[in-house]
Design a protein with these regions (language model features):
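Residue-level recognition of tetratricopeptide repeat
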Residues: 15-16, 44, 51-54, 84, ...
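Start-of-helix register in tetratricopeptide repeats
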Residues: 8, 44, 78-81
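Short, charged amphipathic alpha-helical segments flanked by flexible coils
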Residues: 159-196, 200
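Helix-turn-helix repeat elements of alpha-solenoid scaffolds
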Residues: 17-31
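Charged alpha-helical initiation segments
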Residues: 75, 80-141, 244
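Single-residue signature of alpha-solenoid repeat helices
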Residues: 25-28, 62, 143
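Charge-enriched, short contiguous segments at helix-coil
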Residues: 189-255
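Structural motif corresponding to the intra-repeat A-B loop/turn of tetratricopeptide repeats
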Residues: 20-22, 56, 93, 137
């Protein structure tokens, strides 16, 4: 993993810790800065601090960090992400107020913001999800593959014992696990449906390449809907479910 991605992943853990316990979060961010900011400051660290401040309604401090992150980000893409967040917080708006969820690109960035807010999700799941969303405009099929991975990783994190039982019995498949969770009434029919939709879309994105010649890459990319709001909404349904389930059942993540 590149240093930049390692910083991003670790900053999400520190973000979660601060959101839930500022003392632990301050310590985690201090350690992260000691490790990576000896020569220069890093935009992703300060963006994650800003999100943690915003989660705890410390909006002036959040805005200051978002502005610093924008200055520190080395590429236009991330500067635009920071500016969008600056605009939203400056107007004292939540993601629900700011984004038009009927517009696919807005829905992408709404989802991005919600992942930062869903601090009861597994840290690595949040990282993979944010990474997939950040490149979704140009690599949507790969994002679908990542969303399937997000689903599987979070199921393994939240329902570890059930997954281990299926692995031990050599009967593991994501479809089997989803059906088992529904049979045990751990998830509703609607959640199970959303999970199966993401599972199948990820499978399709993985295997559809086989339908095209090696030199026919453009046709592969073009074979996917560029305005796939349905799958984004399925993903949001799943992420919200797990965030709420983990919070309500006091499922602990490592400090």
């Amino acid at each position: 993993m590149s240093t930049w991605r390692d910083i991003w992943k670790k900053s999400l853990k520190a973000n979660r810790l601060y959101s839930l316990d500022p003392k632990k979060g301050n310590n985690a961010f201090a350690e992260l800065q000691d490790e990576y900011e000896k020569k220069k400051k890093d935009g992703m660290i300060h963006y994650a601090i800003g999100e943690a401040y915003e989660y705890r309604h410390e909006l002036d401090k959040a805005l200051e960090k978002y502005k610093l992150a924008k200055d520190l980000f080395p590429v236009d893409h991330w500067k635009e992400v920071a500016q969008q967040t600056i605009d939203r917080v400056s107007q004292n708006q939540t993601a629900e107020d700011f984004f038009d969820k009927n517009n696919f690109k807005d829905l992408l960035w709404y989802t991005y913001q919600k992942v930062y807010e869903y601090v009861y999700l597994d840290d690595f799941v949040r990282y993979v999800c944010l990474s997939a969303i950040s490149r979704a405009d140009s690599e949507w099929p790969l994002s679908l593959v990542d969303f399937r991975s997000v689903l599987e990783l979070q199921i393994k994190s939240t329902f570890h014992e059930i997954v281990q039982k299926y692995i031990y019995e050599q009967n593991y498949s994501l479809a089997n696990i989803i059906n088992e969770l529904k049979a045990r009434k751990l998830i509703s029919g609607g959640i199970a449906n959303a999970m199966h939709k993401i599972r199948k879309s990820g499978n399709a994105a993985t295997h559809q390449m086989k339908l095209f010649d090696d030199g026919d890459e453009n046709n592969y990319w073009n074979s996917f809907d560029k305005d796939d709001s349905n799958n984004l909404n399925y993903l949001l349904t799943i992420l919200e479910f797990f965030n709420n389930y983990n919070r309500e059942n006091n499922i602990k993540l490592p400090d």
